[in-house]
């Protein structure tokens, strides 16, 4: 549900309501382009209260207040654990592997994350930078990685409507990064976390940086996943928010195929060469043409021809209304 400048409310651009009650009443009586009529309110999620738990400043906490309980996964630079903070708050804890990354780079990740506040971006709670290993403490998402959720969890049975909604949530989080001149550089299902009610949050900002220049050139030697990386980024190290848009198109393909590896049967080198020649993944089985067109728009060769995350968010949020009216249009370059 979105708001108008004059205080009105809307879910689709073509119709708005003066009050929230009017909107809810309308969609309870008539789906009017939504996947189904509204029935009952969503249950309110329990959000941990984390203020006042630090001992030094707003972000630094004593590592003795963290109890690691269960290993959730392992990434390039460390492990992720489920744990408890102060004996009361369930958290996720990311630890730094010794000698795999400069401590200052890991701390810089926290400096980026603590400035980010959006419902679809993973929230930082605290850091432990005194002693080793360094901890980054974040909210804990019930279902963990979207990739595992789609392949092995309850996500194996999600509907197309849920797939579109999850894609829209990710686009919403990336719209925030876009507006604040951040890039992610590793946008993929493995770096999306899923919680109650299929709430999706973009995670792993280890490669994210504030962009002062229009283009960010990564340090030589850093590895990036070819099958998710835009050609100008993979070939020339030119990373922008528009290379994230390319990755988002690949991410949608992961969602609609329940976590299938992109470009099945092709090696990284084959993908890089084929994409540079103009090859694009074909429409996945069962994927509606309008959704595939959105994916193709993300894979335009020229970065400036790709849509913004804001336009992608709006397209996906209005997807069923537009499809019902036959009014889908490929997003215009901005």
Curated annotation (Swiss-Prot):
ATP binds at residues 72-80, 94. Residues 1-42 form the SH2 domain. PROSITE patterns: PROTEIN_KINASE_ATP, PROTEIN_KINASE_DOM, PROTEIN_KINASE_TYR, SH2. The keyword Metal-binding does not apply. SUPFAM superfamilies: Protein kinase-like (PK-like) (SSF56112), SH2 domain (SSF55550). The active site is at 186 (proton acceptor). Its EC number is 2.7.10.2. GO terms for cellular component: cytoplasm. It is found in: Cytoplasm. The keyword Cytoplasm applies. Residues 66-321 form the Protein kinase domain. This is Tyrosine-protein kinase SRK3.
């Amino acid at each position: 549900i979105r708001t108008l400048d004059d205080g009105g409310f809307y879910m689709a651009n073509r119709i708005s309501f003066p009050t929230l009650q009017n909107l809810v009443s309308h969609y309870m009586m008539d789906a009017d382009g939504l996947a189904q009529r509204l029935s009952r309110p969503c249950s309110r999620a329990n959000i941990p209260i984390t203020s006042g738990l630090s001992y030094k400043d707003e972000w630094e906490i004593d590592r003795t207040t963290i109890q690691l309980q269960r290993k959730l996964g392992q990434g390039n630079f460390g492990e992720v654990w489920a744990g408890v903070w102060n004996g009361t708050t369930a958290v996720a804890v990311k630890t730094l592997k010794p000698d795999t990354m400069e401590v200052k780079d890991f701390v810089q990740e926290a400096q980026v994350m603590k400035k980010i506040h959006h419902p679809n971006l993973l929230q930082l709670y605290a850091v432990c930078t005194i002693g080793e290993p360094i901890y980054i403490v974040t909210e804990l998402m019930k279902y963990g990685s979207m990739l595992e959720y789609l392949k092995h969890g309850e996500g194996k049975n999600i509907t197309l409507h849920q797939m579109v909604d999850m894609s829209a949530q990710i686009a919403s989080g990336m719209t925030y990064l876009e507006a604040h001149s951040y890039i992610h550089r590793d946008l993929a299902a493995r770096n999306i976390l899923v919680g109650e009610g299929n709430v999706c949050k973009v995670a792993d900002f280890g490669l994210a940086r504030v962009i002062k220049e229009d283009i960010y050139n990564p340090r030589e030697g850093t590895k990036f996943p070819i099958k998710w990386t835009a050609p100008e980024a993979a070939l020339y190290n030119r990373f922008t928010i528009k290379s994230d848009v390319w990755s988002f198109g690949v991410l949608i393909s992961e969602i609609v195929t329940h976590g299938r590896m992109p470009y099945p049967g092709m090696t990284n080198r084959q993908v890089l060469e084929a994409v540079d020649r103009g090859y694009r993944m074909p429409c996945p089985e069962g994927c509606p043409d309008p959704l595939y067109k959105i994916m193709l728009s993300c894979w335009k060769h020229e970065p400036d021809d790709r849509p913004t995350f804001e336009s992608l968010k709006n397209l996906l949020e209005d997807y069923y209304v537009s499809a019902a009216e036959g009014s889908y249009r490929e997003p215009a370059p901005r």
